[in-house]
Amino acid sequence: MAFTLTNKNVIFVAGLGGIGLDTSKELLKRDLKNLVILDRIENPAAIAELKAINPKVTVTFYPYDVTVPIAETTKLLKTIFAKLKTVDVLINGAGILDDHQIERTIAVNYTGLVNTTTAILDFWDKRKGGPGGIICNIGSVTGFNAIYQVPVYSGTKAAVVNFTSSLAKLAPITGVTAYTVNPGITRTTLVHKFNSWLDVEPQVAEKLLAHPTQPSLACAENFVKAIELNQNGAIWKLDLGTLEAIQWTKHWDSGI
């Protein structure tokens, strides 16, 4: 079902990162009511740039580390919901590309995303009288087919795809729909910092960037298109400037 972003309230976790910042800029062109950015590091210059793009949109920043306990996330969300009354979309975009830091990669890329999602269900779940909502989780094409030299990062992104697909199937119960956007290799500062697990490929970043990539802006444009298409359960591939819905092959069914 097509979705208009006009006059909507959006929370964007990691909305100041490489792809995140360009996506925030694209979102502002859609005349949101509020864009709430949650990020670990405050960037006043970036916030000022965003506010200047569309003065009609209220841009607010809160410091947020996705690795905090759920109780802290819930406390922050209470503050946001008290101010805005309603939130329409949550974008979970926090991610690191560092297979040297195993625990932190899992905590940021997967556990933090799950915890942030779990926390917002307190406010959205229709079983608790909530209005429902839309969750957009940022995965990666490595969630489909791993970059085997970075198995920790790739594994977290596969987990994001499966978690989000489960959320989508739970929508009749919770009232919350969900989908993933999965960028291909995108030219950001993060990619240059890519390193491999146990240094199995010391030049993994250089080798990846030797292949065709996409600019962050092209990815951001398709990112917002995916949000507007609003297909519950969709697995979007954002690669080389294109937007494509992936058809996931079913090899097993739980039967429940």
Swiss-Prot record:
This is Alcohol dehydrogenase. Coiled coil: none annotated. The active site is at Y153 (proton acceptor). Belongs to the short-chain dehydrogenases/reductases (SDR) family. NAD(+) binds at residues 12-35. Gene3D superfamilies: NAD(P)-binding Rossmann-like Domain (3.40.50.720). GO terms for cellular component: cytosol. Keywords: NAD, Oxidoreductase. Substrate binds at S140. The lineage of its organism: Eukaryota, Metazoa, Ecdysozoa, Arthropoda, Hexapoda. It catalyses: a primary alcohol + NAD(+) = an aldehyde + NADH + H(+); a secondary alcohol + NAD(+) = a ketone + NADH + H(+). One of its GO terms (biological process) is alcohol catabolic process. CDD domains: ADH_SDR_c_like (cd05323). The gene is Adh.
